[in-house]
Amino acid sequence: MKLLHVAPSQGTVWVRKGFQVFGRQPLGFASLFAAGLFMSLLLGIIPVLGSIATLALAPAVSLVFMIASRRVATGQAAMPGAIVELFGAGRSRLVALLKLGLVYVAATFLLFWLAGVLDGGALASFFAGLRDSKLTPESAATRVAEPGVQLGLLLRLLFLGVLSIAFWQAPALVFWGDPGWAKSLFFSTVALWRNKGAFTIYSLVWLALFMVLLAIVSIGAGLFGPERFALVAAPLMLVFMTVFYASLWFTFADCFSSSDPVAASRGDDVDHPDPMKGTS
């Protein structure tokens, strides 16, 4: 695979294509997201190990959405083909994907431990205090505003952002390029750095859309009441998250070229996909 450079404006194109590909098969993507949500709920029943397993599966979840988007962009059904294609990748790729998941778990725990050391345990103490039956909303709001808690939140968000750079393209590189899990982390980091302009625009557009969605939810809750509008807000949030995952494929396909016609199918025209065509 060859690393490519894209213009910063391509970030907005990735978002648009996420909406386009979702619009072609909304039920397929919705069923995929529902399957992932159901799996995480099942794993959540298992104490400790369930949370670790859910975290370890994060790279695979992003990959299966990439597979689904590529399939839809090339005129195929998202489900159940995406799941079948994932498990049909071969033993070496699946093992590499599993290693990615385990590294992701280890790195997350390490970074969160470091954040806990740097904030003096303030955030952990805050969450422990939430279990206190005597805690009032006013006292909780006061504690959230404490510098240590704010630092803890900021550090964890920062560390997760840095971690996502290495893992953003890694699952797709393992699946379509097979460079091994360690090299995939390196190439993912290089790809995002080389195309930092496009990824910055991409992130800002998603942030702006999320703020608009929050404003809609806030206004709707004020007009119709939180309980009633929750019936609308929940599906809106789920669609937002699903479209975000659907757009991930295009961030990968534009950053890497391949001699494999299937791997090179980027859905340049979502309505009439050409497998040999690159995005622009």
Question: What residues fall within each predicted segment?
Answer:
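Hydrophobic alpha-helical membrane segments
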Residues: M1-S280
